[in-house]
């Protein structure tokens, strides 16, 4: 065991405690990464607030970058000293989804309580989201890391680990956006801005950003949005349709607010789909009219 510092959550809604924990050495296809930077995702905040429950104590953090400092005996293609991004996407490589080209939704469960970290007393400690990156080091599966050039700063690289791949992935993988289609992105935060970038890369015709902040809408245009709509109005979906000239082919909800999911189908055109990215609190629900969506072949799909 190696003793390291980590920010540990002992009680939901309370400040994290920086304290010593024990980290075991990597085994089999695992890699130890000494972290150079870790970003704070809203998911980390939601977990720490208790929005989704879970085991405590826990170490959160899942957007990280650093140097490989040790490897398990079955690791191939990575060496000590390599610079890597660490993600929460852990893939077994042999379940139905992994075999079918969707490793981001691997079906093999990961027991974070039985992971590589313990309290200094030897008690269970949750490695949240298979990362536990609010720490000096992590031990993760090789499938969770991607080698990066040494020229990329760790602080910048850490943002690739969730915000970028979540936003761009929602557009490219979940929506399968085609050139010339029109999209609405609700929420111009980190994930929303990357959904906007993804839509631009995919060749979208009109990209409408919707947010409560004028400042964020201006930033969204720098990232590729063609139009900005304030969500503070009574019917922002009408403003979005006016900007596009029709309903959207895809609406990306990047905020974890149930009321926004209630409104999302209103932005759609015929055959459009709502892509669900933002995650509300556990136990919350949303409502929509199935008859309206069925009549014009609309749909809803989740995106991790």
Each PLM stretch: what is its role?
Residues 5-7, 17, 22, 34, ...:
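Residues located in well-ordered beta-strands
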Residues 24-38, 48-99, 104, 149-151:
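Glycine-rich beta-strand-centered segment in the early N-terminal region that forms part
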Residues 84, 143-145, 149-234, 238-239, ...:
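Mid-domain Rossmann-like dinucleotide-binding core that forms the NAD(H)/NADP(H) cofactor-binding site
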Residues 239-249:
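A short acidic, Gly/Pro-enriched loop at the edge of an enzyme's catalytic core
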Residues 23, 92-186:
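NAD(P)H dinucleotide-binding glycine-rich loop of Rossmann-like/cofactor-binding domains
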Residues 204, 257-304:
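Glycine-rich phosphate-binding loop and adjacent beta-alpha segment
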Residues 12, 213, 280:
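Residues in the short beta-alpha loop(s) of Rossmann-like NAD(P)-binding domains
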């Amino acid at each position: 065991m190696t003793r390291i510092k980590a920010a540990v959550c002992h009680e939901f809604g309370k400040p994290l405690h920086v304290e010593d924990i024990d980290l075991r050495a990597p085994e089999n296809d695992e890699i130890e990464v000494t972290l150079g930077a870790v970003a704070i995702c809203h998911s980390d905040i939601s977990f720490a607030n208790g929005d989704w429950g879970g085991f405590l104590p826990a170490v959160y953090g899942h957007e990280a970058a650093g140097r490989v400092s040790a490897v398990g005996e079955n690791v191939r293609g990575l060496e000590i000293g390599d610079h890597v991004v660490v993600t929460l996407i852990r893939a077994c490589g042999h379940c139905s989804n992994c075999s079918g080209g969707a490793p981001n939704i691997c079906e093999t469960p990961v027991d974070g309580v039985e992971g590589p970290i313990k309290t200094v007393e030897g008690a269970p400690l949750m490695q949240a989201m298979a990362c536990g990156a609010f720490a000096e080091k992590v031990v993760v599966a090789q499938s969770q890391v991607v080698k990066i050039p040494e020229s990329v700063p760790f602080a910048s690289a850490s943002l690739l680990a969730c915000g970028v791949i979540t936003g761009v992935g929602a557009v490219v993988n979940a929506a399968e956006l085609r050139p010339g289609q029109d999209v609405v992105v609700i929420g111009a935060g980190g994930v929303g801005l990357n959904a906007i970038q993804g839509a631009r890369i995919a060749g979208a015709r009109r990209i409408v950003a919707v947010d409560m902040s004028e400042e964020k809408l201006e930033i969204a245009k720098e990232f590729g949005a063609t139009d900005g709509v304030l969500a503070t109005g009574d019917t922002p979906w009408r403003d979005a349709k006016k900007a596009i000239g029709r309903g959207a082919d895809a609406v990306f909800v990047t905020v974890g607010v149930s009321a926004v999911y209630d409104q999302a189908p209103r932005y759609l055109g015929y055959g459009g789909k709502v892509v669900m990215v933002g995650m509300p609190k556990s136990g919350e629900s949303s409502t929509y009219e199935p008859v309206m969506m069925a009549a014009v072949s609309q749909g809803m799909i989740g995106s991790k």
